[in-house]
Amino acid sequence: MAVILRDINAGYNGRMQLCDVNLDIADRDFVGIVGPNGGGKTTLLRVFLGLLKPYSGTIEFQRDGHQVDSLSVGYLPQTRDIDTDFPMSVADVVASGMNSPRRLFGGYTKEQRERADQIMHTIGISDFARRPVKALSGGELQRVLFARALVSRPELLILDEPDNFVDDNFESFMYDTIRKVNKEAAIVMVSHDRQFVESYAKKIIEVNERIKILR
């Protein structure tokens, strides 16, 4: 797979946050994104995800050398972007990360539920699978969102500050999991943990309206 951004200009309400962005992401790449708050890091992720249409420029997705409309993507947003008042259980939130569609009637298939159960067990959240998300702590919610990002076995995993609110033990487990996923998928991660980014990212870019390739 590949993602190709060319001459991207993007922002909100006419205010530019990204200017002249050109970036290539290849299969099993690991791109670490750093930069100041408000510099456009999350805006760049939203362009990747198709959640924000750029003012100008193009974004192209490829699989096996051929252009496709989209890729299988797992996404972990910042918890502040999540409406925890929405009446869903932990299990439903995790299952919602499936890229394959739900059945028209009856919700998720048996196979989808089994996959959700498997990833919840792996991440260590099975004990509160039936709990409503509004009852979770910040650290618990971050684990749930991490599981949701992984459940579809994505080709591209996008993580926006995944280490927020998690304790040291889970952070170590999460980083180890990310390294394992990178053997099969490309990773794009925004993080303030420069040590991890510098140790494991194959590419490092700094975003502050424009992008600067650091490695």
Predicted regions and their residues:
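Conserved ABC transporter NBD signature motif
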Residues: 54-73
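Helix-to-loop junction immediately C-terminal to a conserved catalytic motif
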Residues: 49
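The feature captures the beta-strand-to-loop junction immediately N-terminal to the Walker
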Residues: 34-36
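Hydrophobic anchor residue at the start of the ABC signature
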Residues: 146, 174
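Conserved ABC ATPase signature
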Residues: 132-136, 140
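Catalytic Walker B motif of ABC-type/P-loop ATPase nucleotide-binding domains
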Residues: 157-161
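Conserved ABC ATPase "signature" region
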Residues: 110-128
